Amino acid sequence: MANPRNEAALAELKARFAETDTVVLTEYRGLTVAQTTELRKALGFDVQYSVAKNTLVKIAANEAGIEGLDDLLTGPTAVAFIKGEAVDTAKVLKKFGEENKAFVVKGGYMDGNALTAEQVNAIAELDNRETTLAKLAGAMKGSLAKAAGLFNAPASQVARLAVALQDKKDA
């Protein structure tokens, strides 16, 4: 690999793998430049979506300690390097795949595990972090209100009992 362009591309891929939380591999065969540009815009700034030679991606991934991608690196492959919320990116990729039949999610890598295409699509069905935290906060708030009601119930029952006893004495 004495080609300087390959060496530069490999160095860039290594850097991306090093600073990335999640990687998704896709097949882009049949997409136009306009469609690819549309996808890049939809993915946003936290995702770098680029086409690279499969051999360079294999080498960079292996040197970064990422295993399990070799079988996915066949045919024309583009890599989505995700720095932020993987769920949001998976949702964008899934929606784009539904709208553009030529686009295929091959699989990926997240939290030390290789992912199949089905697993990436399953991630797209999850709620993102903010929504999950909001649901959790709502559930906790409801539980705390119930607990406060339970703690206040004995005190109000004692007060009602005292009033009833007083009324009985007066009668």
Swiss-Prot record:
The keyword Transmembrane does not apply. It holds the Pfam family Ribosomal_L10. Keywords: Ribonucleoprotein, Ribosomal protein, RNA-binding, rRNA-binding. CDD domains: Ribosomal_L10. It comes from the Bacteria. One of its GO terms (biological process) is translation. GO terms for cellular component: ribonucleoprotein complex; ribosome. Gene3D superfamilies: 3.30.70.1730. Signal peptide: none annotated. The keyword RNA-binding applies. Belongs to the universal ribosomal protein uL10 family. Part of the ribosomal stalk of the 50S ribosomal subunit. The N-terminus interacts with L11 and the large rRNA to form the base of the stalk. The C-terminus forms an elongated spine to which L12 dimers bind in a sequential fashion forming a multimeric L10(L12)X complex. This is Large ribosomal subunit protein uL10. It comes from Corynebacterium glutamicum (strain R). The gene is rplJ.
